[in-house]
Regions:
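Short acidic, glycine/serine/threonine-rich loops at helix termini
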Residues: 1, 22-25, 57-63, 89-92, ...
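Thiamine diphosphate
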Residues: 1-47, 107-108, 112-236
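General beta-strand structural signal in soluble alpha/beta enzymes
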Residues: 12, 48-50, 78-82, 102-105, ...
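Acidic, glycine-rich active-site loops and adjacent beta-strand->loop/helix elements
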Residues: 14-30, 50-55, 84, 107-109, ...
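Conserved thiamine diphosphate
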Residues: 37-97
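Helix-enriched interaction subdomains in cytosolic or periplasmic regions
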Residues: 75-78, 85-125
Length: 236
């Protein structure tokens, strides 16, 4: 907070998400609110990198998912890339954004360490490659089909690879539309709702515990906005 107040751009890492709790009070009461409480005099422009998710034998100390807590802090932006190219593009956008940004990075996607995540490793984009915050990516797009069961999967991070691999294994690539959120806040609601209205069904895939989760909140939002277009309840 102090570094940002004097014009610097701090980039901080919490290693790992399980260790974010001691700093949560400062993130909630100072980082996210400083601009508002000072009437714009002391905006906090910073990046907080957080390796996250289950991988290897980390057990209770290196495997948590904390997005359900972080997304309830107003005043910060949150990104969760699914591959190396997106990480670069989103990090550059975060650097130029005047707001505090939390970047959640799944440990299992570093160097594609988990089987089935080869596409997480990508050729480094150009120096000026930037992805706008708040814009989702339709990774696997399908056309509207009247006589075939279709589905929208909304996901991010590791879930993108689970969804893509599963649709291939089930030979349903032309029936399943996959949306990679990229940014959890601000949320690209327009892309989500457009897809769900087209397919009539939706599955929200995340790694986090389901109770009182980001996934349940998103499912409720989709259900509320797309109710008349849905053929079945939104599942998580």
């Amino acid at each position: 907070v102090g570094m940002s107040a004097v014009g610097l751009k701090p980039i901080v890492e919490v290693q790992f998400a399980d260790y974010i709790w001691p700093g949560l009070n400062q993130l909630f009461t100072e980082v996210s609110r400083s601009c508002y409480l000072s009437n714009g005099k002391w905006p906090v422009s910073m990046i907080l990198r957080v390796p996250i998710g289950a991988y290897g034998s980390g057990g209770p100390y290196h495997s948590s998912s904390v997005e359900s807590v972080i997304t309830n802090i107003r005043g910060i932006k949150i990104v969760y890339p699914s591959n190396g190219a997106d990480l670069k593009g989103l990090m550059k956008a975060s650097y130029y954004d005047p707001n505090p940004v939390v970047i959640l990075e799944h440990k299992g996607l570093y160097w594609s360490k988990i089987p089935g995540t080869k596409t997480a490793t990508s050729v480094e984009p150009s120096e000026d490659y930037i992805l706008p915050l708040g814009k989702a990516w339709v990774l696997q797009e399908i056309w509207k089909q009247e006589d075939v069961e279709t589905l929208t999967i909304v996901t991010y991070g590791m879930g993108v690879h689970w969804a893509y691999n599963a649709s291939g294994e089930l030979d349903m690539r032309d029936q399943v539309e996959i949306i990679d959120l990229r940014t959890l806040f601000p949320l690209d609601e327009a892309t989500i709702m457009t897809s769900v209205k087209k397919t009539g069904k939706c599955l929200v895939v995340t790694e986090e515990p389901s109770n009182n989760s980001f996934a349940l909140a998103l499912a409720g939002k989709i259900q509320e906005n797309c109710f008349q277009y849905l053929d079945a309840p939104v599942m998580t």
